[in-house]
Amino acid sequence: MYAIIETGGKQYKVSEGDTIAVEKLSVKQGEQIVFERILHLSTDGTVKIGQPYVEGCTVKGTVLSHERARKVVVVKYRPRKNYRRERGHRQWFSLVKIDKIEIEKTS
């Protein structure tokens, strides 16, 4: 079973037990988070595709930590003018462990 979720403007393919790095979430370390924007759900041969989201399905996870990515260095340079500038940036991200993919039973 897997699902494709949307968070932070990006899409992630997740299964139960996966650990993913997503854009920084405003949830404390160790707390539960519920993803409700499910774009695609595949279970035992059946596939549900959302228009735009799958109804009655949630993905639950636990925030493991908040970390910073490797530094991205941006260089500005003008030839023959002795002009050089170097700036660095480290983006925050959250590590999330996917605990459960829940599907609401419909009768």
Curated annotation (Swiss-Prot):
GO BP terms, alphabetized: translation
rRNA-binding as UniProt keyword: yes
GO CC list: cytoplasm; ribonucleoprotein complex; ribosome
Keywords tagged on the record: Ribonucleoprotein, Ribosomal protein, RNA-binding, rRNA-binding
MF terms (GO), sorted A to Z: rRNA binding; structural constituent of ribosome
InterPro entries: bL21-like, bL21-like_sf, Ribosomal_bL21, Ribosomal_bL21_CS
Subunit composition and interactions: Part of the 50S ribosomal subunit. Contacts protein L20.
Function: This protein binds to 23S rRNA in the presence of protein L20.
NCBIfam families for the chain: L21
Protein family (similarity comment): Belongs to the bacterial ribosomal protein bL21 family.
Protein name: Large ribosomal subunit protein bL21
Native source species: Pseudothermotoga lettingae (strain ATCC BAA-301 / DSM 14385 / NBRC 107922 / TMO) (Thermotoga lettingae)
